[in-house]
Amino acid sequence: MFGVGIFEVLVILIVAVIALGPNKLPQTIVDIVKFFRAVKKTMAEAKETFDKEIQLSEIKQEALKYKDTLESEVNKLTKDIRLDELREISVDSLTKPLQETKEVLSEEAKNLQSTLESLNSDISYESSAAAQTPTTQESIPTDSTREIAYATQKPQNSIDSINSKESSVDSLHSPSIVESTQSSSSKDS
């Protein structure tokens, strides 16, 4: 235990017998043994307590690791749940208005298509009627014919716009436009 050999123990006993005497030596040996037992017991208890503390600290560290992993997983799940809710909300909130807008646009497209077809049939009817009944009557164009002529032309630059205005004024005096405006005004009345 202390690195003491047999020879050294014999030397210590001889010195103790001479110093203490034969009467006090047995009591001193008992006291020394009790002292070493108490020191050994105290050291064992300290070691045991130290080991328990180490185990507790390891358990605490493991518990903290588990706690951290659980918290991170819970945070991930709550984020995923929030994202799923947002996706559902955004998908539902976007698909319904888009579907309604699509339906409205398709109805408007059908209305525009039918209006276009009716205008095409009116124009073809008027052009066929104008080809069958030629007239030589010239009159001053009305405001509605000017609006039609200007609305149908789209000049690209200033020179084209001047030329197109001159040609539209000349075309307004033509007999076919005058007849078409007169026939459309008679239909309206």
Swiss-Prot record:
One of its GO terms (molecular function) is protein transmembrane transporter activity. It is a single-pass membrane protein. InterPro entries: TatB (IPR018448). GO terms for biological process: protein transport by the Tat complex. Its main location: membrane. Keywords: Cell inner membrane, Cell membrane, Membrane, Protein transport, Translocation, Transmembrane, Transmembrane helix, Transport. Residues 153-189 have a biased composition (Polar residues). The chain crosses the membrane at residues 1-21. Belongs to the TatB family. The Tat system comprises two distinct complexes: a TatABC complex, containing multiple copies of TatA, TatB and TatC subunits, and a separate TatA complex, containing only TatA subunits. Substrates initially bind to the TatABC complex, which probably triggers association of the separate TatA complex to form the active translocon. HAMAP family: TatB. This is Sec-independent protein translocase protein TatB. The lineage of its organism: Bacteria, Pseudomonadati, Campylobacterota, Epsilonproteobacteria, Campylobacterales.
